[in-house]
Amino acid sequence: AYVFLAAAKVGGILANNQYRAEFLYDNLMIEANVIHASFLTGVEKLLFLGSSCIYPKHAPQPLKEESLLTGLLEETNEPYAIAKIAGIKLCEAYRSQYGCNFISAMPTNLYGPNDNYDLQGSHVLPALIRKFHEAKKRGISEVVMWGSGTPLREFMHVDDLADASLFLMQHYNEAGFINVGSGDEISILELAQMIKKIVGYEGAITHDSSKPNGTPRKLMDNTRLTQLGWKSTITL
């Protein structure tokens, strides 16, 4: 049996900040239970999927795997990041102590069908799609964005991650985790303008500077994965 451990409690800045205990506890329990059960039942291989938020807030960009645990985390999603780092370390520990073929991959920001569009808990891309769609439908004159719009983010279609996950199951057996990204970045404001144009919204974009920006830049270094022979194919 092969286990793809993609289950997690996830959300944007608002949810991460508001439910800090839940984000830490729920994610620790999910990964600990599944990883331990996989060991007990003797699964052939397990892939644990983490997140790019594991990296320190001021880590050099693009983010390389060796930057893990070299500095302080972004405060807004620290509980989630700590849980994901624990998942990586669990896989490494079970490999070291029991010889389990448990591997870890850290995907960048994902988007795609069946995303979470709840404004209280969604990530930035689905949140913006919903905001612009509803503003157009209701004739609202402006869409308010959190922060300045200057942070840079990388996005990957979920189908690309599925493809990369299968590739890693077949070709990757190392103890250390590996980045999975698209290699392309865009500012949040540019993303908003793109969505505004696609939706056909004619109103204005305004900024709520009282709300946090999050990490200034988050781009993955995909060198290791590219060298193995995989790269993303779906552009934003």
Short names for language-model regions:
Residues 5, 32-77, 103:
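Conserved Rossmann-fold NAD(P)-dependent oxidoreductase catalytic core, especially the SDR/UDP-sugar
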Residues 28-34, 43, 83-91, 125:
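Conserved catalytic Lys-bearing alpha helix of Rossmann-like short-chain dehydrogenase/reductases
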Residues 134-236:
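C-terminal substrate-binding subdomain of Rossmann-fold SDR/epimerase-dehydratase oxidoreductases
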